[in-house]
Amino acid sequence: MEEFIIKIAGTKGISNFKSYHFSIISNYENFFNFILPKDVKDVLVVLPFDEEKTKTIKHAITNARSNVSVTIMYSGKIRDEMIIGWRT
């Protein structure tokens, strides 16, 4: 992951980074409802650049956890996966 992403995550207090391959996810809303803690406050998602996937993922997170702040960042180092971190 790029250094600037790590710095931004640190300023937001976000940790617990995990990587998930897109092929394992059939329903994004169910996926986020399962992996995100109920008391999550901030979520940082690192994606390969894809506007449609970005909209889909942001919508799914806000549907799964309505009171969460979502930050989406892009990385040229990843292709078929997303990296997710959060703060409770």
Swiss-Prot record:
Any Pfam family matching the protein: DUF4898
Highest taxon, organism lineage: Viruses
Name this protein carries in UniProt: Uncharacterized protein 27
